[in-house]
């Protein structure tokens, strides 16, 4: 083993010189330069500074504008709530602990931070899955005479929370555990050890299959079918430049959504799986910290992609920020009207919202 395992922690450094200490009690500056902890704290502050306004504004604008409170937008509000969980339950904690250079909040704080960060991340993950399924159902109509309504939206929300809890709760009750990871300033699921009595092996396999491979397969399938439907509609109206433009726009948005999903989850899942399958191999603290950056930054770019790219949400946000008047209203309105009239598969139907 190329690390030091202790009660409820694993430090990725052999204690050959006796300098390794518990990440709950002592600064971990022997792992990386103290400047790296300052950089981590600054990064967390940036995520809070950007993530809170974007996601809070999403909720506020929806409350203010009744036309946004439609079943198809429920999942976007769920995504904003998930991101706020990450901001308050994860980012603020990591910023505070990185300022001290170790997980100063102790074992209980590690459980709470790990739980809320995992819960928020998983709600966000399954919200993207439900979002893809909803768009596929609305556009491709795999079920004839199906009309998406409020009950379906509520079922989708309940599903995201059930799946998120199915991932975040088990480490609190003995199936795996939360321990400090990376630079030892944030907590996550124990991929690092085979600690007796925690069944880490089965939990990691369960997470990798049920909370990464299956969601990724569903997202790829739904957006793949959606793209096929849009291209078929565009092929049937080849003479319409507006339809072709709408098809290109939808393709661009789908590619962005899929790439963002992969950027968010593939590095973290890949590194976690490598650590799990190569236990005892040597790796540095930054090896797990950097992929976590990609997953955490989703609280910023997911709202930008799934909410701010939606014309209706964007219009209402600008109206709210500009005290009730949208200076771009005429331009956006003309564009939307033209596209809606000319295309049988409007890009707004398959846009992020």
From Swiss-Prot:
Q: List, alphabetically, the GO terms of the cellular component aspect.
A: membrane; photoreceptor disc membrane; plasma membrane
For the region Disordered, give the residue spans: 330-353
Location comes to: Membrane; Cell projection, Cilium, Photoreceptor outer segment
Chain intervals with Low complexity compositional bias: 334-353
Keyword annotations for this protein?
A: Cell projection, Chromophore, Disulfide bond, G-protein coupled receptor, Glycoprotein, Lipoprotein, Membrane, Palmitate, Phosphoprotein, Photoreceptor protein, Receptor, Retinal protein, Sensory transduction, Transducer, Transmembrane, Transmembrane helix, Vision
Please list the disulfide bridges. Answer: 110-187
Residues bearing N6-(retinylidene)lysine are: 296
Q: What is this protein called?
A: Rhodopsin
Give the source species.
Answer: Tetraodon nigroviridis (Spotted green pufferfish)
């Amino acid at each position: 083993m190329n690390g030091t395992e202790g009660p409820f922690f694993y430090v990725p450094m052999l204690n050959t010189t006796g300098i390794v200490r518990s990440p709950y009690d002592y600064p971990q500056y022997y792992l990386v330069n103290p400047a790296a902890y300052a950089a981590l704290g600054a990064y967390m502050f940036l995520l809070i500074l950007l993530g809170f306004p974007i996601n809070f504004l999403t909720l506020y604008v929806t409350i203010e504008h009744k036309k946004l409170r439609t079943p198809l937008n429920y999942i976007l509000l769920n995504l904003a709530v998930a991101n706020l969980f990450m901001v308050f339950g994860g980012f603020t904690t990591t910023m505070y602990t990185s300022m001290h250079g170790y997980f100063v909040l102790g074992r209980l704080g590690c459980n709470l931070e790990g739980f809320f960060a995992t819960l928020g991340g998983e709600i966000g993950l399954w919200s993207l899955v439900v979002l893809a399924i909803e768009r596929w159902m609305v556009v491709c109509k795999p079920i004839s005479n199906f009309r998406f309504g409020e009950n379906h939206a509520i079922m989708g929300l309940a599903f995201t929370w059930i799946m998120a809890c199915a991932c975040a709760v088990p480490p609190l009750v003995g199936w795996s555990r939360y321990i400090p990871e990376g630079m030892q300033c944030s907590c996550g699921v124990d991929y690092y050890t085979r600690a007796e009595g925690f069944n880490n092996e089965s939990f990691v396999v369960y997470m990798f299959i049920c909370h990464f491979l299956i969601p990724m397969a569903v997202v790829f399938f739904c957006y793949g079918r959606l793209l096929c439907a849009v291209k078929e509609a565009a092929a049937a109206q080849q003479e319409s430049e507006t339809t072709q433009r709408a098809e290109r726009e939808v393709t661009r948005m789908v590619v962005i959504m899929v790439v963002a999903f992969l950027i968010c989850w593939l590095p973290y899942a890949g590194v976690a799986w490598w650590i799990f399958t190569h236990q005892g191999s040597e790796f540095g603290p930054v090896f797990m910290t950097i992929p976590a950056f990609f997953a955490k930054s989703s609280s910023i770019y997911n709202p930008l992609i799934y909410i701010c790219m939606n014309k209706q949400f964007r219009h209402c946000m600008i109206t709210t920020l500009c005290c009730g008047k949208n200076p771009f209203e005429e331009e956006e309105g003309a564009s939307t009207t033209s596209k809606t009239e000319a295309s049988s598969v409007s890009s707004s139907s398959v846009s992020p919202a």
